[in-house]
Amino acid sequence: QGEGGIRSFSLEILKLIRGLCDDTGTLLIVDEIQCGLGRSGKLFAHEWFNINPDIMTIAKGIGGGFPLGACLSTKNASIGMVKGKHGSTYGGNPLACAVGCEVMNNVLEDGFLENVEMMSRYFSQKMLGLLSEFPSVFEELRGYGLMLGLKTKIENISFTNEAFNQNLLLAPASDNVVRILPPLNITKQEVDYVVKLLRKTAQRLEN
């Protein structure tokens, strides 16, 4: 969950849900709008758990900032979607689809997802250091890949506001979590700079 505070499912829970869906003939719908398209370090986050959904929603990253979304499904799940059953006034916009194709070309380039994983490990290591350095400010690090969350002991809005004053744009989420969603092509030097700004923010707010 992104809005819920970067809450990750466990492998056991996901396998249980997949099994329940199989046993009852229920479709498993996976929302990859925030965590998909490489943000987790794999093309789709569910790949980390070897779980295959029946329906999957994707958006945000697929458009690279351009409004675009898609719904993917297995053949069995889409059997009722015959011609005329689904449509939208501006669906299939040629410009949006061209942008999406170019985004996919970049994400699928050799080394792109590997770099996301590498930067994720580096970023997480640096932020765990911040947790140790500022125990009165930070409580927990959450997330996968470059979809990370810092649970704060102070009000998360106070943290994001002070970060904004330091020219760092962060997003608050539920459970008093600050979301950190850097671009997937972030460099090691840029990670260091973000951590520097996080440290300055924490210094301003620590008790």
Regions found by a protein language model. Give the residues of each.
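Conserved N-terminal phosphate-binding loop of PLP-dependent enzymes in the Aspartate aminotransferase
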Residues: 1-207
